[in-house]
Amino acid sequence: MLHELLLRLRTPAVRDLAWTLLSPPMLGETTQVQRHPLQASCWTRQPQQLADWLAQQDSDASAVHAWLASKPVRRLGLYYERLWQFALHAAPDVEVVAANLPIRQNGQTLGELDLLLRDDEGEHHLELAVKFYLGTDGREAADWLGPGSHDRLDLKLSHLAQHQLPLSSRREARGALHDLQLDETRSAFWLGGYLFYPWPHYSSSPHGATPEHCRGRWLHQRNWSDFASTSPGAHWQPLPRLAWLAPALINAGGVWSDEMLQQWLNTLRPEAQAQLLVRLDEDRAGDWREVERVFLVNDQWPAQS
């Protein structure tokens, strides 16, 4: 359903909203419980209702724009959380009891509970994350690194298991949960995002990856010319970080010329942070749609500070 919706939806925030709600999880097999936040909602049982709601948001995006503007964020993970919060507040059979609830001990914040929900299946503490991991040369979670090479899939899963998910069960959380009339909260997580595979080399998916996970490729700056030559005449351009969720849709006036891309490449520093670029194809309406995405990393990656 997501593919068909993205052919119709045009508002960037609503496209990101649709991707957030409907894209597959990164992992299908996990040691900790993974639960879609809308699992018990009629929007999951009757997806046309969700599609209709998203179409309404696209025709009048004032509500989602107002929601996002009420608490502006610069980090992609927080933007992802805000989109989830907007949808869950609108879902007809899900109650958002609290979001980003701080848990403190002697005045010191131990952490925050991303979401506390109530639905037909009970009370839930959910941790949300969206991640972009680049594979090196193995199937272990430790072989999949964030674009900055500091984050790793195994570290994220460990942090979820050892800190984030148990937080709602700690003694320090009981008072806050009791005040919200939450007594038997079950913890779970939802991990969205993309896995990027090396070019020109090959890498297998990490253990437990969902077969239909969102994916791309990554390459070093030194390999760009060879990579670009595999799709001659293609239109490539970088995306700003907050535009990394849904596949890009760019109108004719926003597409870069070959000269603009070359100028950007010429000014890209050798030690630059990883850049996300998309390859765009023109559709029959004259819009340009993403058909491929790649991370361009510096030639020292992942050995960088």
Model regions: which residues?
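Intrinsically disordered, low-complexity Ser/Thr/Pro/Gly-rich regulatory segments
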Residues: M1-S305
